[in-house]
Swiss-Prot record:
Organism whose genome encodes this protein: Chromobacterium violaceum (strain ATCC 12472 / DSM 30191 / JCM 1249 / CCUG 213 / NBRC 12614 / NCIMB 9131 / NCTC 9757 / MK)
Region Interaction with substrate tRNA, residue ranges: 37-40, 161-165, 244-249
Gene name of this polypeptide: miaA
InterPro entries xref list: Dimethylallyltransferase, IPT, P-loop_NTPase
Protein name (database record): tRNA dimethylallyltransferase
Transmembrane segments: none
Amino acid sequence: MSDTPQAILLMGPTASGKTGLALELARRFPVEIVSVDSALVYRDMDIGTAKPTAEEMAACPHHLIDVISPLQSYSAAQFHADANRLIADIQARGKLPLLVGGTMLYYKALLEGLSDLPQADAALRAELDADAALLGWPAMHARLAELDPATASRLNPNDSQRIHRALEVCLLSGKPMSELIAQGKEAAAGFRFLPLALVPRERGWLHARIAERFRIMLEQGFLDEVSRLRAKYPELTLNLPSMRCVGYRQAWEHQDGLYGHDEFVERGVAATRQLAKRQLTWTRSLDAIPVDAQRDGLAGLLGDAVDDFLAGRPPAESLRYAGDF
């Protein structure tokens, strides 16, 4: 196997069949699966996140599942560091990293790098706001052009939010924001990825799968799971990232009597559809190969693409889905 860090990325919207396809690939290749899902990191949240079953996880090693409490948070920066470490570790064991999930921000961090930008500073922000109120944003844009011409050249002189952030980064770090972003992309360029994105040929197909999966989760005891979470973690609130996972807020509010069971199901399914729509929007912005999730024999075609990737060949052009999604 190549010494260059390399991995297969299998992304796609919720309920598009990623887990099943990943397990099919695990039967053909010596893979270890790394979850790319901001919901699967939480312990005790199994049903509502459609976490792989114990049997599925026993089929091959899985990583980044059940790593934190629902009271904690997990950032894209943490994922980026963990994924880079795991890719290296898995490859050192002679295995192939297979990254699977639907958190597109995490994929963006892998494919485009994660820039080491400084955190916002309240005092500097207030100072820049005062300058802008006095001078106007075109003058602040001219100031940015002196410090970071590359960033200024792509911003409208009245784009206050982005000019503000670019100036803040320059003044806090002592470096142009464009330089810091380029460094992140340079680090990402040291990896070889085969980015495969499952997309639905028909939106109705995906919507039907979403509704069916929500029905199955209810049969499996999703509402009981939410009750157990609330009992086990008294500090849990709807403001925590874990409870922003699709379905959990709706279940919580249903249990609190805000609406009945039928409306809870409608809201849960609708929220999942909205998530899928956002995931597909993200997918269009990423440099990934769109693949028809409804295509017959898809597992074999993806396996052939992995064979080509490992041999240093480009995937067959026939794999790429040319339609709208």
